[in-house]
């Protein structure tokens, strides 16, 4: 039997982009459902570094980026390679951005952002595999279907399921 869930927005993928999108929309009063194919914590191959521009976006989301909150601040980009001794390129001093970057493992970063989205009112559903978009008779996307047959309906669907986005390709 197929069950159906309705939202204002369905976001597929709870990586940094999907979780941030969901949190911003929920803060503006929309009912958002965030679907993630695995359960947290989960790992992802990544350099784990955040530039000052990325840090600014975390601040805009309302994330505590202090070292006391467990973040490792960096003063610049450390370069290692070839026959040159390692050196640091300091982050540029720009008035609109913090003067530091950060390092955070993706196992920690992704879960922090997803839990933050939940704290903003987002309905986070983990361990669901989105298989395809649901189309209305005119061909407009009106939701998504998961491998267990559950349908998540919304007038807006965001494909934030990564570089090899199956949903994005199907859209």
Task: Give the positions of each predicted feature.
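A conserved beta-strand/loop capping segment in the N-terminal third of enzymes
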Residues: 55, 60-111
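Conserved N-terminal glycine-rich FAD pyrophosphate-binding loop of Rossmann-like flavoproteins
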Residues: 39-61
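Beta1/beta-strand and adjacent pyrophosphate-binding region of the FAD-binding site
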Residues: 2-15
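Short phosphate-binding/catalytic loops that engage adenosine nucleotides
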Residues: 30, 63, 122
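N-terminal Rossmann-fold NAD(P) dinucleotide-binding loop
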Residues: 18-19
């Amino acid at each position: 039997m197929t069950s159906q869930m309705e939202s204002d927005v369905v976001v597929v993928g709870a990586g940094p982009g999907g979780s941030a999108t969901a949190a911003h929309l929920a803060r503006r009063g929309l009912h958002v459902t965030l679907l993630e194919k695995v359960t947290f914590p989960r790992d992802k191959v990544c350099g784990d570094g955040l530039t000052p521009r990325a840090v600014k976006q975390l601040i805009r989301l309302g994330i505590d980026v202090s070292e006391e909150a467990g973040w490792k601040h960096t003063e610049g980009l450390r370069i290692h390679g070839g026959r040159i001794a390692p050196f640091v390129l300091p982050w540029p001093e720009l008035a609109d951005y913090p003067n530091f970057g950060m390092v955070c493992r993706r196992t920690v970063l992704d879960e922090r952002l997803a839990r933050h989205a939940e704290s903003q009112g987002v309905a986070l559903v983990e361990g669901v595999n989105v298989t395809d978009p649901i189309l209305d008779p005119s061909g407009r996307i009106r939701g998504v279907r998961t491998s267990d047959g559950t349908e998540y309906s919304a007038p807006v669907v965001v494909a934030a399921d990564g570089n090899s986005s199956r949903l994005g390709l199907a859209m």
